[in-house]
Regions:
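Positively charged n-region of N-terminal signal peptides that target proteins for export
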Residues: 1-5
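Bacterial N-terminal signal peptides
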Residues: 9-19
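Structural signature of FAD isoalloxazine-binding scaffolds in flavoprotein oxidoreductases
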Residues: 163
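Intrinsic low-complexity, intrinsically disordered segments enriched in polar/basic residues
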Residues: 6-9, 93
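Ca2+-coordinating acidic residues in Ca2+-binding motifs
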Residues: 166
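Sequence context of c-type cytochrome heme-c attachment sites
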Residues: 23-160, 169-218, 225
Length: 227
């Protein structure tokens, strides 16, 4: 009797486990579909949708650059996502302005050098919160000692980290000779990209930024000012 009961419990469990194994074996990289629509909604809800004069939050880019729930776009021939939003969200770039280790280091520097605290914060936020930093300086809203951690705490664009617009608005002006986050930000809402002849209709209407091919976006000099 006991053996029969155990068999009755074990058999369905074996079937479930086998089904899961076979499903995984058949398609270890499931396409984005079904429940992943919820993931897309989460991405759209969590990312910054703030709009500034020179920058726009990554949440305004997600409509076109997030995973396709039907698995038809932004996946390769094997169903792997090639969504820049998914790749970016897991990086230090996306979390640069919220990284607790960085915030602790900045706080420590301020404690050691209290007379220079705000100036130090201004230097650090140039690379860790470039959208907030440059938006404040370019619009003249930065304080006398620059863009501080207090400014960052209430700034959605700054907390978006090294967001989409932070890199895609960098003009090709002496990039290899720059340092300390001295980024030449385009003043005309141009979004430089690595693909030639982009269609600008949807993107300019959705975000206000015009996609333009920029050869420099394929070169490491774009990263040089901070790295």
């Amino acid at each position: 009797m006991k053996r029969t009961t155990l068999f009755a419990i074990f058999l369905p469990l074996l079937a479930v486990c086998t089904g899961v194994f076979l499903t995984s074996a058949e398609d270890p990289h499931q396409k984005f579909k079904g429940d992943d629509a919820a993931m897309m909604r989460w991405l759209m809800g969590e990312l910054c949708t703030e709009e500034g004069v020179y920058f726009t939050g990554s949440g305004n880019c997600v409509n076109c650059h997030a995973p396709d729930p039907d698995g038809e776009a932004l996946v390769d021939e094997n169903g792997h996502t090639v969504s820049p939003v998914v790749d970016w969200q897991a990086t230090m770039m996306a979390n640069s302005a919220r990284d607790p280790f960085w915030k602790a280091k900045v706080a420590h520097e301020g404690l050691v050098n209290p007379e220079h605290r705000e100036s130090i914060e201004n230097v650090c936020t140039a690379c860790h919160a470039p959208q907030g930093f440059h938006e404040a300086h370019l619009t003249g809203t930065a304080g006398p000692n620059g863009y501080t951690m207090a400014d960052l705490a209430d700034d959605a664009l700054g907390l978006d980290g090294v967001g989409c617009a932070a890199c895609h608005t960098i003009d090709d002006i002496n990039l290899a000779g720059r340092s300390n986050g001295d980024l030449p930000i385009n003043p005309e809402n141009v979004a430089w990209g690595g693909f030639e002849n982009p269609w600008d209709g949807l993107m300019s209407g959705q975000t206000g930024f015009i996609p333009v091919y920029g050869e420099h976006m394929r070169n490491s000099e774009v990263c040089a000012s901070c790295h």
